[in-house]
Amino acid sequence: MGMLIKNGNVVMVEDGKIRKMDVLIDKGIIVEISPEINRSDVEVIDIEGKFLIPGLIDMHVHFRDPGYTHKEDIHSGSNAALAGGFTGVLMMPNTDPPPDNATVIYYWKEKSKSIPLNILFSGCITKNRAGKELSKFYELKEAGAVAITDDGNWVADGAVFRHAMEYAAALDLLVITHPEEPTIANRGVINEGYWSTVLGLRGIPKAAENIAIYRDIEIAKMTGAKLHVAHLSTAEGVRLVAAAKKLGLKVTAEVTPHHLVLTDEALAGYDTNLKVNPPLREAEEQKALLKGLLEGVIDVIATDHAPHASYEKNVEFNDAPFGIEGLETAFPVLYTELVLKKKITLEKLLLKMTVNPAKILQLPKQGDIKKGNYANLTVIDPKLTLKVSEELLVGKSKNNPFLGRTLTGWPVMTVYQGIVAYQRLLKGVQ
């Protein structure tokens, strides 16, 4: 049976337009978009007063499966993604065992095949993410990997990374770098600056990120490979990516919601849910990130969804793991803090969360609301205001930095290939 979504404020991202339209879906495909469509032989869903947007695509999630399923697993992570309005995610490889061979990719594929979510897979750059010996990229690509990364670790050996980039270029594989020079980061836990001094915590200098980005871009220039810079957090990093783009290099970059809306001042209370890597930076760095986003230097907003069990986070700040739970609150955080405050338009925000990640990951018929595209869609209620609580979150872990915050503009329905995969039930959570 088909589906007709009526009276939605449809955001056509690439056109930069919001129009009140009806959308007809048949066999998982958008077959018609028109001001008025009337059909009695399909399921009709009236979304008067709400936005219909392309399903969000997150290029950076950690589902912790296999190896750390007390934090998250593919099913719970997928539930969190769908609740957040996402219809596509790219899984990172810091699992145990890691996907440095086809076996883990096949495990992921088998476990995710019945889930109504486009789950994409990354393979490791090096065996065991140890930075020494290359994984078999061809085998990983044949198994289904769309990118390679040692995320969580930077490939510090320049010769190894050069060979990886040459190998990836030959296979047209995207390389995602985690830019942090470890000897400069030197076991820091927050941004090096005023707040690290006040709080008595070891700082992570911005130079650790900047030096890694500089080296990786230089190797991208040597090899012609596609390089994606994960979780930018510094003004200098933005400048380096901008310079690479001006040279015509195949370099793209992402930023997280938390780096766009929070600064290191938020750590004054030693909240371990705000302990992330890269760390939250000063307001000046945050302004540069937003400027880079608006100017097109930063292509993508990605959550870096990194769940941890409560007992792992409820320890001394130095001992707590890095990472936050980010999928479920990403859109309302950005809508509340950026769109409603007129720092970015809804259309431009969605460009970074739908069209651009679809292009970078080479996902055909995804990322926008167009005739012939897959019916991967999200309904947003722009007036729905909810207080973030542990009870509201559906993922396994609750390490969300926005707990207690009141946010507006929540996903209320997620449609994957013409099937309602998630619907928000509001009773008892407002």
Curated annotation (Swiss-Prot):
It catalyses: (S)-dihydroorotate + H2O = N-carbamoyl-L-aspartate + H(+). One of its GO terms (molecular function) is zinc ion binding. InterPro entries: Amidohydro-rel, DHOase, DHOase/Allantoinase_Hydrolase, Dihydroorotase_CS, Metal-dep_hydrolase_composite, Metal_Hydrolase. GO terms for cellular component: cytoplasm. Pathway: Pyrimidine metabolism; UMP biosynthesis via de novo pathway; (S)-dihydroorotate from bicarbonate: step 3/3. GO terms for biological process: 'de novo' UMP biosynthetic process; purine nucleobase catabolic process. Its EC number is 3.5.2.3. Zn(2+) 1 binds at residues 60, 62, 151, 304. Zn(2+) 2 binds at residues 151, 178, 231. Substrate binds at residues 62-64, 94, 277, 308, 322-323. Binds 2 Zn(2+) ions per subunit. Keywords: Hydrolase, Metal-binding, Pyrimidine biosynthesis, Zinc. It is an enzyme of class 3 (hydrolase). Coiled coil: none annotated. SUPFAM superfamilies: Composite domain of metallo-dependent hydrolases, Metallo-dependent hydrolases. The active site is at residue 304. Its cofactor is Zn(2+). Catalyzes the reversible cyclization of carbamoyl aspartate to dihydroorotate. Belongs to the metallo-dependent hydrolases superfamily. DHOase family. Class I DHOase subfamily. This is Dihydroorotase. The gene is pyrC.
